[in-house]
């Protein structure tokens, strides 16, 4: 019986595909390793007064800084309202209909807002009256 279980587990392990990681994760990990290597060699060079900093490490550090700057700019652009093309597309969609027309999406959004506000008001009222029946 144990041989059968062992063989099944062995077969499952041998036939399983390794989990692949997204490419972005591997690139970030490689950049962090490159940064650590660069800083270590720079520290070692500073202590020994020897310039053995590798050009590959310098390029890796520059790549890391470039990606960090690109990510920071993307976050900043999204915080300010998205990319210019996205803002223009949103403006066109917003003003495509007549101003007096009521959009179904707006109605659903307002209904959702009212539902959440009513639920929150009921919860606050229940807590003000002594809590929910389960808490008494």
Curated annotation (Swiss-Prot):
Signal peptide coordinates: 1-26
Domain of life: Eukaryota
Major location category of this protein: secreted
Protein location: Secreted
Tissue: Expressed by the skin glands.
Keywords from the named record: Amphibian defense peptide, Cleavage on pair of basic residues, Secreted, Signal
Positions of the pro-segment in this chain: 27-136
Positions of the UniProt region annotated as Disordered: 82-101
Listed GO biological process terms: antimicrobial peptide biosynthetic process; innate immune response
One Gene Ontology term, aspect cellular component: extracellular region
Family to which the UniProt record says this protein belongs: Belongs to the gastrin/cholecystokinin family.
Function: The pharmacological activities of caerulein are quite similar to the physiological activities of gastrin and related peptides.
Protein name: Preprocaerulein type I'
């Amino acid at each position: 019986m144990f041989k059968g279980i062992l063989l099944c587990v062995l077969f499952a392990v041998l036939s399983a595909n390794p989990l692949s990681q997204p490419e972005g994760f591997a690139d970030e990990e490689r950049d962090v390793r490159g940064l650590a290597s660069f800083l270590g060699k720079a520290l070692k060079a500073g202590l020994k007064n020897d310039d053995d900093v590798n050009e590959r490490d310098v390029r890796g550090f520059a790549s890391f800084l470039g990606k960090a700057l690109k990510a920071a700019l993307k976050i900043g652009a999204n915080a300010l309202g998205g990319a210019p093309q996205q803002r223009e597309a949103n403006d066109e969609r917003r003003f495509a209909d007549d101003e007096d027309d009521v959009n179904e999406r707006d109605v659903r959004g307002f209904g959702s807002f009212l539902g959440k506000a009513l639920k929150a008001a009921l919860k606050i009222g229940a807590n003000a009256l002594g809590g929910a029946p389960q808490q008494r």
